[in-house]
């Protein structure tokens, strides 16, 4: 504010606009995100382009690189306070930790579900045959025209935006956090 020469009234207005309770408004303005939870999507989008995932796997507690897609989702959730609040689990493994957590709480939908922003999308990649176990995870950014748009960590060893048709055979299902 100093570098722009804001007066006291302008500083107060800026502080009001940037207050936490306006995060969903800014998600709508900046990213077109409505419904669901825009806060975790905003955090995830801010990380697009990261290569190697070091901030996420090291935050989780690993001392060297691991398959870090779940660490990325957990890190984003932690930035929003969702792990501490019990809204999303801290997990590093999709099949043994992430999926069961949502299923046990009745917060699970199969791949025919039309997701909302902030839902957690799990995949069962067809790399040598699907095994009925989730092996990748991301965050739903939005749904438009029958496609689900995602932000995924460890997608080609970076944070990337991707999209898939709703009901795509490699989508294992969705965790639907109770935001």
Regions found by a protein language model. Give the residues of each.
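Non-catalytic extracellular/periplasmic "stalk"
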Residues: 1-30
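Residues that form generic nucleotide/phosphate-binding pockets
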Residues: 17, 43-47, 101
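N-terminal capping segments
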Residues: 22-82
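...with weaker cross-activation on analogous glycine-rich loops/strands in unrelated enzymes
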Residues: 83-157
């Amino acid at each position: 504010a100093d570098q722009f020469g804001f007066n006291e009234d302008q500083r107060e207005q800026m502080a009001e606009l940037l207050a936490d309770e306006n995060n969903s408004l800014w998600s709508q303005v900046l990213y077109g995100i409505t419904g669901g939870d825009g806060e975790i999507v905003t955090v995830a989008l801010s990380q697009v382009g990261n290569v190697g995932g070091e901030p996420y796997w090291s935050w989780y507690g690993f001392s060297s690189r691991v398959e870090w897609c779940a660490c990325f989702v957990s890190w984003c959730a932690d930035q929003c306070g969702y792990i501490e609040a019990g809204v999303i689990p801290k997990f590093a493994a999709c099949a043994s930790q992430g999926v069961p957590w949502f299923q046990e709480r009745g917060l699970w939908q199969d791949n025919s579900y039309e997701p909302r922003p902030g839902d957690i999308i799990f995949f069962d990649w067809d790399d040598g045959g699907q095994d009925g176990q989730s092996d990748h995870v991301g965050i739903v950014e939005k749904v438009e025209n029958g496609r689900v748009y995602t932000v995924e960590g460890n997608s080609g060893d970076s944070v990337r935006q991707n999209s898939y048709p709703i009901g795509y055979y490699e989508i294992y299902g969705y965790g639907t956090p109770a935001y």
